[in-house]
Amino acid sequence: NVELVSGRLIDVDTLLVATGGYPEVDLARDAKLQIENGIKVNERLETSDPSIYAAGDCASFDHNGGFLRLESVGNAIDQGQTVALNIAGKKTNFNAKPWFWTEQFDQKLQIAGLCDGFTDIIERKVKNKVSFWYYRNEILLAVDSFNDPYSYMTVSYTHLRAHETYT
């Protein structure tokens, strides 16, 4: 049960505790870089000043007509590798392969892909494991899994690794 401030009790199967943040962009703004939900970058993670790169939680890239920041360790590593290749002169475009995990007490949440724009969702539940599979016109976009590493691994290693871009 979850007790609200009003004292009312609500039955829940799972409670997710999450926080969010805003990127610190003062230095980028002072450097006259473009800001759009973070430090705006192009496909090579260059800022509006091509001699400056941004990576990690602060980097905001074009995604489906908007600007997206992926706030996760995996994304920071992937973007850092792309920036390093570009600095070394190997022109490389960033290819977002979103994945995320967190453990909260005895619950494990894992996410692979992005579910924005989904048209259908399939729920798979077995005992204390549940996963949600997101599709757009029969194309798998993402999976959210709770205590179900098999579903997460299936999507992250077979589906996400096989695709070059996500729209």
What are these regions (language model features)?
Residues 1-3, 40, 101, 132-133:
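Residue-level detector of beta-strand face positions
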Residues 2-3, 8-82:
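FAD-site-proximal beta/loop scaffold in flavoenzymes
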Residues 7-8, 107, 139, 165:
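Well-ordered beta-strand scaffold positions
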Residues 49, 119, 153-155:
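Short acidic, gly/pro-rich beta-turn/loop elements at beta-sheet edges
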Residues 58-151:
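Mid-to-C-terminal Rossmann-like scaffold of FAD/NAD(P)H-dependent oxidoreductases
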Residues 150-160:
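A short, polar/charged loop-to-alpha-helix boundary motif
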Residues 159-167:
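Single conserved hydrophobic/aromatic residue that forms the stacking wall/gate
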